[in-house]
């Protein structure tokens, strides 16, 4: 594990200056142009960074292969689940309370003007071009993502500058300890953000490293009074989803939340004046979070795919017995139950009647007939949410049937 200069300053004070000089002047160091920092920024291409970059690309290939094996309903259901989880987690990190239900409602109806519609719609459009070329582009993302909600919730956080904030802002721990002051005045914020964007698009730096550096610099600059964390995590998610499988863009905040102490600590260590502008520790941490996101994603996809194949075999056998001789009905009911099983395993809500009609390509009346058939309805769970019904497969019942046949 990389030992930051902040720790070396205290653990090895006699050699601190020499160690800093060796790191700074190393052939494996990369120096960055960023004016608004106490020291010249740099990082080292460590073995750990090389291993992380290799693992991330390998895991990306694994994710792509797994996604290719997934049926359409499973893939879209899982993407929706990950999107909702990501928004819940990015809000929770900032202490913003939101529920799965209110996020789900906006996902189903993106034109809704309910609370959080901005952030939901922005994540729904993660695959669309949201290029950042200048400071104004960052402000535009912020406006679309969180500003509407912030304006209505906290009048003190309304922006008062030309692009960003005009006044100072401090970053505090949960106990009220001040750990950082964002850049000030606004012309410095704009200058620093412009330089950070240049680093983000640098052809001289590995793109995943550049995204990690930009994520740190965004937190260091802190261009807004509120919403900085959610905006920077969205930007990182967007650029990671361009470089890797798009599902990765819906997993970043989830993994950051799981490693929140290390995440905040890496900011604090890197901000420390004794760290002398060395970004290596932060880069290793952030790439580690990305790598863990991918291993967690692989595990989640593998586990669900194994269960889907397992339940499919049970369904083929059971439905064949229940509708013996009626090949047309066997095919229709098996198709229905396979879709319901996908929605059950790969989402939290099941699937609506309208979506079933769309996916199975049969009329609403026909779908109702299949769902309410006396020979099959014991395998279906109906969840009523106001006027909307969501359907899912009773996987516990399928397990019981399988055990009784063992």
At which residue positions do the language-model features occur?
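FIC/Doc superfamily catalytic core
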Residues: 1-406
């Amino acid at each position: 594990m990389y030992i930051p200069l902040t720790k070396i300053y205290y653990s090895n004070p006699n050699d601190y200056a020499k160690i800093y000089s060796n790191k700074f002047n190393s052939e494996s160091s990369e120096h960055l142009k960023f004016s608004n920092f106490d020291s010249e920024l740099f990082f080292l291409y460590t073995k750990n960074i090389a291993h992380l970059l290799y693992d991330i690309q390998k895991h990306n290939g694994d994710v792509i292969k797994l996604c290719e094996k997934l049926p359409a309903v499973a893939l879209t259901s899982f993407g929706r689940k990950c999107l909702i989880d990501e928004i819940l987690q990015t809000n929770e990190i900032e202490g913003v309370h939101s529920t799965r239900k209110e996020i789900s409602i906006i996902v189903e109806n993106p034109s809704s003007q309910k609370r959080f519609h901005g952030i939901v719609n922005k994540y729904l459009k993660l695959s669309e071009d949201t290029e950042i070329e200048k400071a104004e582009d960052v402000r535009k993302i912020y406006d679309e993502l969180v500003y509407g909600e912030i304006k209505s919730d906290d009048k003190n956080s309304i922006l008062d500058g030309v692009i960003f904030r005009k006044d100072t802002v401090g970053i505090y721990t949960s106990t009220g300890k001040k750990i950082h002051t964002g850049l000030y005045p606004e012309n410095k914020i704009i200058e620093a953000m412009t330089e950070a964007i240049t680093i983000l698009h640098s052809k001289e730096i590995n793109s995943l490293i550049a995204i990690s550096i930009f994520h740190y610099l965004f937190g260091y600059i802190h261009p807004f009074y509120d919403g900085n964390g959610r905006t920077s995590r969205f930007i990182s998610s967007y650029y990671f989803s361009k470089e890797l499988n798009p599902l990765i863009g819906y997993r970043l905040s989830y993994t950051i939340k799981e490693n929140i102490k290390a995440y905040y600590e890496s900011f604090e260590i890197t901000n420390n004046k004794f760290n002398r502008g060395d970004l290596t520790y932060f880069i290793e941490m952030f790439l580690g979070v990305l790598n863990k996101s991918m291993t967690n994603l692989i595990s989640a996809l593998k586990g669900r795919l194994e269960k889907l194949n397992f339940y499919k075999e049970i369904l083929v056998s059971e439905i064949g017995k229940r509708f013996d001789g009626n090949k047309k009905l066997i095919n229709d009911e098996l198709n229905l139950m396979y879709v319901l099983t996908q929605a059950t395993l790969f989402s939290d809500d099941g699937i609506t009647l309208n979506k079933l009609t769309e996916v199975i390509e049969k009329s609403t009346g026909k779908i109702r007939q299949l769902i309410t058939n006396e020979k099959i309805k014991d395998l279906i769970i109906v969840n009523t949410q106001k006027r909307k019904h969501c359907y899912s497969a009773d996987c516990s019942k399928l397990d019981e049937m399988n055990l009784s046949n063992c």
